[in-house]
């Protein structure tokens, strides 16, 4: 996705990963 941050929380239809 757009945000290549950290853990395995995938949000949105873009498959963005956010810090858990």
Curated annotation (Swiss-Prot):
Report if keyword Repeat is assigned.
Answer: no
Annotated region Disordered: where?
1-20
UniProt keyword RNA-binding, yes or no: no
User: GO molecular-function annotation terms?
Assistant: carbohydrate binding
Sorted UniProt keywords: Lectin
Q: Which family does it belong to?
A: Belongs to the jacalin lectin family.
The protein's role, per its UniProt record: D-galactose-specific lectin, binds the T-antigen structure Gal-beta1,3-GalNAc.
Record's subunit section: Formed of four alpha chains and four beta chains.
Name of protein? Agglutinin beta-2 chain
State the species of origin.
Maclura pomifera (Osage orange)
* Lineage, broadest ranks: Eukaryota, Viridiplantae, Streptophyta, Embryophyta, Tracheophyta
């Amino acid at each position: 996705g757009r945000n290549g941050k950290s853990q395995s929380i995938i949000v949105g239809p873009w498959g963005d990963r956010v810090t858990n």
